[in-house]
């Protein structure tokens, strides 16, 4: 496994990446040593990889427990966290245990918060199994669960001791999740690392099928993009807020969809909305909007908000965005990361945020919505969200 050191201010941890490297993952976990390994996963990943990992750890490293949580963003809340904590304690968790977060962004968040809270902090190792997790969420110290009014509103910052990633695990990932993950790569290219746009544009595949070498390049470019803005901002309150590009409208759409729109696909919609806001406000050209639409289309995800998501719910959740408080409070604006051009972020009040007029953002959200269709013409949620360029 190749090793890259993730550095954020005084925080450092290794990111080990390989392909078909489960042996290496088991060996490394054994080297870390634990009184008990607490593998946290959702049912699908538990069936694919969790049981095998538990058995091999038990044989080669020490006692191991597999603890599952209900899948889906809609289940990433305080009740699920409470249930996991109770189960971990019943299974023998102590201060020398390691929480192994085996899964995607939802698992990583809830397991990360679990590790931060058990005994006021025990060791955390991420074993990401999705594109979003491998190239985005495990590169952050943010660990959070959702509240009823919005996404990722209850949490803390907590450092993993390692990330152990095997791209072979992406082969069993549903296509919709691969497409969704690529939207975070598009975000990195547009907001932080425009030098990768041309190669990324040529390599994006709407069918969601990527060879291992392409996936490795994408992951390493994402590591570099994150490093540009978090190397001196571990809490992502300064330059690191650029990583929130597309997340204002994106989180509102994702949360309002009750899990039907995956995270990356929602962020893609949020980026298109942000580009339109910049253009309509006179801060960016129409070409920036076109570039957003072109790159999003090449990922294979939709470019419109599905018609069955109530726009009133989206607008309501915009008011509870997790960036509130960085700019002076106003009932007439939303704090947003906006671009002037690729890689050039608009700045105000000493931050990378702009107070975007609420009326303009609401209008853009309305225009981004898919036109209502007769019920008989509707497909299932997954096809609607990810079936085409919109």
UniProtKB/Swiss-Prot annotation:
- A GO term (biological process) for this protein? antibiotic biosynthetic process
Q: Where is this region: Disordered?
A: 371-390
Function of the protein: Catalyzes the intramolecular carbocycle formation from D-glucose-6-phosphate to 2-deoxy-scyllo-inosose (DOI).
Name of the featured protein: 2-deoxy-scyllo-inosose synthase
Active site (UniProt): 142, 244
Q: What is its EC number?
A: 4.2.3.124
Q: Which UniProt keywords apply?
A: Antibiotic biosynthesis, Cobalt, Lyase, Metal-binding, NAD
A molecular function annotated in GO for this UniProt entry is: 3-dehydroquinate synthase activity
The entry sums up its family as follows:
Belongs to the sugar phosphate cyclases superfamily. DOI synthase family.
Name the positions where NAD(+) binds: 42, 73-76, 105-109, 129-130, 140-142, 151-152
Q: In which pathway does it act?
A: Metabolic intermediate biosynthesis; 2-deoxystreptamine biosynthesis; 2-deoxystreptamine from D-glucose 6-phosphate: step 1/4; Antibiotic biosynthesis; kanamycin biosynthesis
Say which enzyme class the record assigns: lyase
Catalysed reactions, as listed in the record:
D-glucose 6-phosphate = 2-deoxy-L-scyllo-inosose + phosphate
What happens to activity at different temperatures?
Optimum temperature is 42 degrees Celsius.
Q: Which InterPro entries is this protein grouped with?
A: Dehydroquinate_synthase (IPR050071), DHQ_synth_fam (IPR030963), DHQS/DOIS_N (IPR030960), DHQS_C (IPR056179)
Do you know which Pfam families this protein is assigned to? DHQ_synthase, DHQS_C
Q: Which residues does the annotation say bind Co(2+)?
A: 184, 247, 263
Give me the comment on cofactor binding. Answer: Binds 1 Co(2+) ion per subunit.
Cofactor(s) named in the record: NAD(+); Co(2+)
